[in-house]
Amino acid sequence: MVEISRWALVLLMLFICSATAAEPDEDHHIKLTKEVVASEDIISQLISGEPVRYDNVTISGSLELAELQGSLSQPIKITNSIFLGPVRFAAASFDEPLDLQGCIFRDNVNFFGCRFAGGAGFAGVTFEGQADLRNTDFGGQASFLSAQFSEDASFRNSQFAGDGIFLNSSFARDVDFDFAQFQRLASFADARFVNVSFLETQFGGHTSFLNAKFHGNAAFAATRFAGSVVFREAGFLLGSTFGLSSFGGLADFTNVYFNKTAYFGGGKFTDLAYFVNARFDGDLNMEDSRLYNMRLDNVSLQEDSKINLNNADFTKLEVRWAVIKDRLVYNGAAYLALVKNYKSLEWFDDADDCYYQYRRIGQDQAPWGWGKISDLISWLSCGYGVRVSYTAFWCLFTILFFGVIFWAGKGMNKFEIVGMELPGDHRLRPTARVSFTDALYFSIAMFTTSQAPVNTYPVGFYRHLAMAEGILGWFFLGLFVVVLSGVLIR
């Protein structure tokens, strides 16, 4: 029994040793079997028309097809491989799909002027050098899913007839899509950019920048979005420019973060512009823009952030006045347009507050003259016609003021009559000084009816004050009725 246990222990130790020794041998075997293919061999296959299929190989040398005549009609599939030298396929035409999924390009890549009739697969590709894809024609789907660009890249003036997929792609340096055209879906969701430019780029289908992050300057100048575009959850950490851009469908900027100035000057939104819960740490410039329906519900603005609506034309702008009242750049036309907008939304309190601030700022900026004096009177008396409380205050103040004057100055007497009360009767006799209640009652009567109560009459100079109070009463009561009608009857 002891002998059997001893042999079992020996066999177990031999098994463990063999397994431990086999592990590095296996890794070494994998490294040795990674095939190295010369670029000349691939060029020969391409020229001869042979199908090109490689996986997990290392391609040495420079891969150039500058002298190739005609198009490449064979399928080309090189996946999970490493290109050590530069790759140049300038002006090449690929009739069949090109699949370079998972490859790594150590040097520069040039596909300038290429035509991909069957689509191009660059999913998971890493470009460690510069990537030149200018004037490229993608006839089918162009997939750059999770592609990484370590140096500058350019898709300038490229045509995307199929879907353009840049989902989860990363651009560590500058990239431009200037004058490019996307006829169908364009997806940049979860993409990462430093400096990116979409100058006069045209997006014909649905476009998505969902959760994209722009760490540098993002330029969408004169960009045309024919369909809906989604920037939901995106972050613009430096400047963002959408000047002269046009949005033909829904523009979704929900929960977007703008760290610097967001410039939409001259932009055109023909459908709903949705900025709900957006955050602006800089300014929002909508100068000269055209807005059909813009929603700014629950937006977050810094204390020094400004909103510029100068010369903006908007049909419907949904944002509460309390959110923008201290941040709106003053422009008379913009304020009056906002007043009209609030009235159409039936936000009458917001309309009144907006109009009040418009008049107040205009009054402060106006030079001294009759116009400014009339504005001061309008401000103090009725709050430019939108503050009925101002007029009510002056009514009560006038009554109380004159009541105190009449009482404190002994400016009125109260007469009593023995027997019948007859005007001018010799039996009328003055009593002692009137009480404050009687003086206040007299002031109310003069303010509302301009007629003194029976047996109460001002004396001396106070008769003129009573007449003045009657005139002020007619003025303030008439003003009160007008302002109250304007506030209550919409």
Where in this protein do the model-derived segments appear?
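Intrinsically disordered or highly flexible coil/loop and linker segments, enriched in small
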Residues: 348, 364, 402, 411-414, ...
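Short, well-ordered alpha-helical packing segments
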Residues: 336-339, 469, 485
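Bacterial N-terminal signal peptides
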Residues: 8-18
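Pore-loop/selectivity-filter region of tetrameric P-loop cation channels
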Residues: 370-388, 415-472, 479
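Bacterial N-terminal signal peptides that target proteins for export
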Residues: 1-8
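Juxtamembrane/interface segments at transmembrane-helix termini
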Residues: 404-420, 483-490
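Selective detector of the "anchor" transmembrane alpha-helix that sits immediately C-terminal
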Residues: 388-410, 471-482
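N-terminal leader/targeting and pre-domain segments
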Residues: 22-375
